[in-house]
């Protein structure tokens, strides 16, 4: 039987996942992180994108987070995020529309254009599409 670590994924709405996992893969500010049992303690920011949990038995579950924090302790991994969605619940067509709208907004900047907000919308839509694509690969 593979070694496991307890993982909690929590959003502003409440607990989304709680259980034993063999591996957590998340997108941190410095790149992808793979967290396995026995990982060194760590706290880091997370970028918008997929979080992949490899559960006992090797099955994978993919979530989308809008960004947040990852805390690793000897027997626990905790993900704190503003927004969490199961990848299966994401609408790929809607994410593609949001991506196009954000790209158009960046191209049509006017006098009161908020570049930071437009770039954030673009990054979020792109991260949702990456999450959907990653979920498809895992199937």
Curated annotation (Swiss-Prot):
UniProt keyword Ion transport present: yes
Cysteine disulfide partners in this protein: none
Gene Ontology cellular-component annotations: plasma membrane; proton-transporting ATP synthase complex
A Gene Ontology molecular function term of the record: ATP binding
Keywords assigned: ATP synthesis, Cell inner membrane, Cell membrane, CF(1), Hydrogen ion transport, Ion transport, Membrane, Transport
Location within or outside the cell: Cell inner membrane
CDD domains named among the record's database cross-references: F1-ATPase_delta
Coiled-coil blocks: none
Bilayer topology: Peripheral membrane protein
Family named by the database record: Belongs to the ATPase epsilon chain family.
Role, per record: Produces ATP from ADP in the presence of a proton gradient across the membrane.
Assembly mode: F-type ATPases have 2 components, CF(1) - the catalytic core - and CF(0) - the membrane proton channel. CF(1) has five subunits: alpha(3), beta(3), gamma(1), delta(1), epsilon(1). CF(0) has three main subunits: a, b and c.
Protein name per Swiss-Prot or TrEMBL: ATP synthase epsilon chain
Organism field: Pseudomonas putida (strain GB-1)
Name of the gene encoding the protein in the UniProt record: atpC
């Amino acid at each position: 039987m593979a070694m496991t670590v307890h993982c909690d994924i929590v959003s502003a709405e409440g607990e989304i996942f709680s259980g034993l996992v063999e591996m957590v893969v998340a997108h941190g500010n410095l790149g992808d992180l793979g967290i396995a049992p026995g990982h060194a303690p760590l706290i880091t920011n997370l970028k918008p994108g997929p979080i992949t949990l490899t559960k006992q038995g090797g099955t994978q579950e993919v979530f989308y987070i809008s960004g947040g924090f990852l805390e690793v302790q000897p027997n626990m991994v905790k993900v704190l995020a503003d927004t969490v969605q199961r990848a299966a619940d994401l609408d790929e067509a809607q994410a593609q529309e949001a991506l196009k709208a954000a790209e158009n907004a960046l191209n049509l900047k006017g006098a009161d254009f908020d570049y930071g907000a437009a770039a954030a919308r673009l990054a979020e839509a792109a991260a949702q599409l990456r999450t959907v694509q990653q979920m498809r690969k895992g199937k």
